[in-house]
């Protein structure tokens, strides 16, 4: 297929999508299609419990399996805390590459790099983990109760935002009718056709390159630099193309794992989540609970509105702060509301 180059500038001209022909004919190489010489395949061991301390983890049998080149867990991973969402990179830092505490079913416990994906999967079955289960919460209201067990060391509240305009109390007093109702939105997985995947290369010169369908290559680059203590000049993040993101690939998911394994082995490492791995073990759209109170005149004029929102961050902060700030203001753009 030959693409036609626009002849009369940009405005009012149909612009060709340069990679469209490759994609519709199945020739485009996504990260999951990429291979490099001596490349290893990675698989991740996920937590079967919602919240627990890892009392012990024995990877010795997995390490001895023929074809296994590295096994990583919290014991031999960087201890640096980070926020996986580039928008909040200097915000609340709650994650590690691997942690001695798991905080949701599907949290990362360990990872293996092996000559084949099949060998890596076999190695996962040889890892022995003992968990000390801790309290967990399925509803955000329970996590907010006094005396609730902290999912992280400080508090179960990541951020509280209050925005005001006008005089809500006065507006409600002037209203002819007051309506109150509760609303709830579910957590939704972004469901991109391409699952989370990455391929990391660590050169003997100390340069780290990560290929990933990221929606935030610069945020990923900064995070990887900080996690592994590398100068920014030694870290490169490349997005060769993305098979759908919809916001779900703003956060880092597989990239720190492949980077760590590549640094341990000195060989390229690729990790491709299956669909069954991707949905429980990556990021979802936040679920929310909203209470809305609206004061109105008889002619339908809105004179005051008040909204309380609880945003469910799940196990880690990620981009929650941006969502909280957005929810505290965006709704009131729908209607002219003086208070």
Where are these regions (language model features)?
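General beta-strand structural signal in soluble alpha/beta enzymes
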Residues: 26, 70-75, 104, 179-181, ...
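Flexible, low-hydrophobicity surface segments
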Residues: 1-157, 178-181, 264
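Glycine-rich and small/hydrophobic secondary-structure elements
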Residues: 90-119, 246-296
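Alpha-helical support elements that line or immediately flank enzyme active sites
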Residues: 44-74, 110-130, 198-265, 311, ...
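Solvent-exposed alpha-helices and their adjacent loops that cap or buttress functional pockets
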Residues: 16, 34-38, 94-96, 101-106, ...
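Glycine-rich loop/linker segments at domain edges
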Residues: 13, 19-25, 87-88, 159-198, ...
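Short coil/turn connectors at secondary-structure junctions
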Residues: 38-41, 66-69, 99, 106-109, ...
């Amino acid at each position: 297929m030959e693409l036609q180059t626009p002849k009369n500038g940009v405005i009012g001209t149909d612009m060709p999508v340069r990679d469209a022909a490759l994609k519709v004919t199945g020739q485009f190489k996504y990260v999951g299609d990429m291979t490099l010489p001596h490349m290893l395949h990675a698989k991740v061991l996920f937590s079967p419990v919602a919240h627990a301390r890892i009392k012990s983890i024995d990877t010795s049998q997995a390490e001895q399996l023929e074809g296994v080149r590295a096994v990583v867990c919290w014991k031999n991973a960087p201890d640096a805390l980070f926020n996986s969402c580039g928008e909040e990179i200097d915000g609340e830092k709650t994650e590690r590459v691997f942690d001695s505490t798991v905080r949701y079913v599907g949290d990362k416990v360990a990872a293996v790099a092996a000559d084949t994906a099949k060998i890596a999967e076999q190695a996962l079955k040889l890892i022995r983990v003992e968990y000390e289960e801790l309290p967990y919460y399925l509803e955000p209201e329970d996590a907010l109760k006094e005396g609730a067990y902290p999912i992280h060391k400080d508090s179960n509240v990541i951020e509280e935002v209050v925005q005001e305009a006008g005089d809500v109390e006065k507006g409600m007093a002037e209203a002819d009718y007051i309506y109150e109702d509760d609303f709830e939105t579910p957590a939704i997985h972004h469901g991109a056709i391409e699952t989370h995947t990455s391929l990391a290369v660590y050169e003997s010169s100390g340069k780290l390159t990560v290929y990933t369908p990221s929606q935030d290559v610069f945020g990923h680059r900064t995070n990887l630099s900080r996690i592994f203590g590398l100068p920014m000049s030694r870290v490169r993040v490349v997005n060769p193309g993305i098979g759908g993101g919809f916001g779900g690939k703003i956060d880092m998911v597989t990239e720190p794992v492949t980077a760590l394994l590549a640094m341990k082995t000195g060989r390229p490492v690729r990790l491709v989540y299956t669909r069954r791995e991707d949905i429980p073990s990556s990021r979802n759209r936040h679920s929310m609970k909203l209470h809305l109170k609206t004061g109105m005149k008889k002619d339908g004029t809105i004179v005051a509105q008040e909204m309380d929102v609880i945003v469910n961050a799940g196990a880690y902060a990620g981009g929650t702060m941006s969502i909280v700030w957005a929810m505290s203001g965006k709704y009131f753009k729908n209607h002219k509301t003086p208070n």
